[in-house]
């Protein structure tokens, strides 16, 4: 029944998204890019694609930072067009996608400020999808309560800060604890929202968000080895969802070394090849190919 009425509210934007997909670079385009000897060659190769205009006004010599900046602006422009034309529940879904960027921007600013980084440089590094009006004021916050009261109370992140007030001082360890508490609350909230929509959204996003929750649980476990973070506090940072939850989470909360983590994670069939390269460094960038393989 849902399919019969989908086009009433979603048909136009689905067509827009399909257009975005069709404009993406093809394997042939990427093969041509591998033959480029410099960035001007890259600009010339892109000129024959749908990306032909996004570097047209960039002066020579072309810089890699300019390419990254223009590509980000293109992504943001296309995303904002979708959000501006969406109706509920799609509009709310797209809002949720920006919350992770907000969290990253908040942590970037308070960490950079703690270490005396230039405010303007920090603001320039913030992702546009995570921008909100009071973001610059984060640079003067000295504790969690002030951070919430003066900056975040009017943002969507305010609901996720309820469990953060035990960390009153903004030092490196507490900032990392705040980051993980925010992500825990965000992922659980996003998952509940997707389940409330039901249908393909609940099914597809359930898989993706469960994987993201497990990835964060694994990262928190490994990164806490050799730190002042207690096992009890570590367990509180784990999202209450995912294929590892609850048994795997409980076991990871007690783990002391990587081999134990590996054994626990490999108990989940989808994750048996996760540690194949035996690389701790690779865990932080685990890709969703592990989902597609199953």
Language-model segments: what does each one mean?
Residues 289-294:
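Conserved small/polar residues in nucleotide/adenosyl-binding loops
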Residues 91-99, 203-211:
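Short, recurring structural edge motifs at helix starts
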Residues 195, 206-213, 217-224, 234:
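Acidic, serine/threonine- and glycine-rich low-complexity intrinsically disordered segments
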């Amino acid at each position: 029944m849902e399919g019969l009425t989908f086009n009433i509210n979603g048909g136009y934007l689905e067509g827009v998204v399909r257009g975005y997909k069709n404009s993406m670079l093809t394997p042939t385009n990427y093969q041509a890019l591998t033959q480029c000897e410099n960035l001007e060659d890259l600009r010339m190769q892109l000129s024959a694609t749908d990306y032909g205009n996004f570097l047209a006004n960039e002066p020579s010599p072309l810089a890699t930072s300019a390419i990254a900046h223009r590509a980000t602006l293109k992504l943001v422009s296309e995303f904002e067009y979708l959000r501006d034309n969406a109706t509920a529940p799609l509009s709310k879904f797209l809002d949720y996608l920006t919350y992770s960027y907000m969290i990253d921007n908040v942590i970037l600013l308070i960490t950079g400020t703690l270490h005396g980084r230039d405010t303007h440089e920090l603001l320039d590094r913030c992702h546009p999808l995570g921008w909100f009006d009071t973001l610059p004021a984060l640079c003067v916050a000295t504790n969690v309560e002030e951070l919430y009261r003066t900056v975040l109370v009017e943002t969507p992140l305010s609901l996720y800060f309820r469990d953060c007030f035990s960390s009153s001082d903004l030092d490196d360890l507490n900032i990392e604890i705040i980051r993980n508490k925010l992500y825990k609350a965000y992922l659980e909230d996003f998952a509940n929202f997707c389940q409330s929509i039901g249908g393909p959204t609940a099914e597809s996003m359930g898989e993706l968000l469960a994987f993201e929750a497990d990835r964060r649980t694994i990262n928190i476990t490994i990164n806490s080895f050799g730190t002042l973070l207690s096992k009890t506090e570590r367990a509180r940072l784990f999202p209450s969802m995912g294929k590892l939850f609850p048994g795997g989470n409980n076991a990871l909360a007690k783990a002391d070394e990587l081999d134990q983590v590996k054994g626990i994670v490999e108990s989940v069939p989808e994750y048996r090849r996760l540690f194949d390269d035996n690389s701790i460094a690779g865990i932080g960038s685990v890709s969703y190919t592990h989902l597609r393989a199953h």
